Amino acid sequence: MKKILFFIPAALYYALIFYLSSRSYDIKIDILFFDKVIHIVEFALLGLFLSFGYFMSLKSSLMMRAVLTIFTGIILGGLDEFHQYFIPRRSIEFFDVIADAVGVLSGFLLYYYFSRSVKGKIFTEKLSKL
């Protein structure tokens, strides 16, 4: 049961993503690939939170935790895009899912490198004792 608590940040953050993507926007920003950059950044944060959950709750191999983090992030990105089909003035874009996957991978790598640092090891050790 305690291990599920490590996924609360990811669940809350995904709820925020879902809420924000449920809104119809009339504002268009005419910067090339701006929306893809936003997808990468928001899903990099999700990747950080998912990585935190998997690293803290599983003692499996690095590869397994990487696959689970990236697979979960891609599924969540796909679900987010699918639900936008039902929102006025929103649409499904395949390249948004690609940007989401790049973001999740980036978030995983950031978490992995942080967790290998001295500060990251101390942080992880303190949390695992809770």
Residue ranges and their predicted role:
Residues 1-88, 94-97, 101-130:
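Bulky hydrophobic segments
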